[in-house]
């Protein structure tokens, strides 16, 4: 997926790869000087994605109490390692539905609640793998906003929680979590940071064949299905509301570009639906993909292999329909 670097005449080829385990901050390294990059310099950046981990840390069925080789972040870790070995430059993202889905998730949320001073088990594993950023899935809201705020170390400004300044700062994941289309009813602002700009240095090849290092700023924006307002009405009604994927992207993507994003990655916990667009639709990614400025779209939620015969009959989800969609693997709900 070639795109022109905003700050240099380099070409970046970004290949998106989806790895599904199935069931913090900006991390920026800013510099006051930008090195000159020769015209024709090229690089390849592999974007790796997990989705719908659902607290499947190990390949284990907690109900049957036996190993299950079809699931597990431990198994996906080997795929991540292999992809990193094959590509000099990689970034790792997650598309949400992380904290709920197994007995372990319920145990840490409902039976023996994870302490504020401890990190959720799945986040410990993900931090070991070195994720760069991730979105928020619909199942993140299943245990309520207080619990979600605790395990992600977010002090939500919502009606039914204490003022943010009074909320404890707890252990959350080390990577940036982004969500643009869920906003507080108190101030109309997103309850998570809507996007993050990540400064990275990647290996590239100069026109003369020599190896060089070039800076790149990767913008990452997150979305979740607006239908959470029905699915988790008891936890969300009166506290938050949602905005449509297209409208939200049209608001923030130009802002990300204006701040210097060379590439904009949209992580949307949803799938492609060729129905007419609605701001409340569950799987609005065919429409999201058409928003100008989005270079990469990473999806999840549907627990299906993306390029099925039915999916191939849909319009392209590649931004501006100019790039082939990545082959992806998802899993059962």
Can you name each region flagged by the protein language model?
Residues 1-10:
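Bacterial N-terminal signal peptides that target proteins for export
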Residues 28-30:
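Composition-driven, intrinsically disordered low-complexity tracts enriched in small residues
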Residues 32-333:
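Acidic, metal/ion-coordinating pockets
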Residues 12-16:
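Alpha-helical transmembrane segments
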Residues 18-21:
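C-terminal motif of bacterial Sec signal peptides marking the signal peptidase cleavage site
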Residues 23-26:
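Bacterial signal peptide processing site
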